[in-house]
Amino acid sequence: MILLIDNYDSFTYNLVQRLGEIDPNMDIQVVRNDELTLDEIAERSPERIIISPGPCTPTEAGISVECVKRFAGKLPLLGVCLGHQSIGQALGGKIVRARNLMHGKTDMIHHSGGRLLNGLENPFQATRYHSLVIQPDTLPAELEAVAWSEEPHGGR
């Protein structure tokens, strides 16, 4: 089962839909970031956790940061936008305002390949929608940047 933590963002269901297209039999449980405790997450025994985008900062994202602290290294974690920032903050990265706000703007995204990005062109065009980033020089050693934009300084 995949547990998807919803940070009160409609894009959460875009993720659910896409995952269902990949595997229609995939068991996906969506919970709001303030509906479960960490112990209740553990009781559900997810195989993976996805943390969704949202309209706030990681500090304001319910259990998102604490979930990463508890399950990092034990379960595969994927963060999208705010979820990505929550993973970065939980592991010691500093979340800062992006030099340029990217609300609905397209950019070319480069990547290092690998399982997650397999089959995507390199680079590929993506729509970006964020105003916060992990400050690049604070990227925790446990994390590896596998995709980045062409925008320097704050594009990761």
Task: Name these PLM-found stretches.
Residues 2-4, 11, 17, 22-46, ...:
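Amide-donor transfer/coupling interface in amidating biosynthetic enzymes
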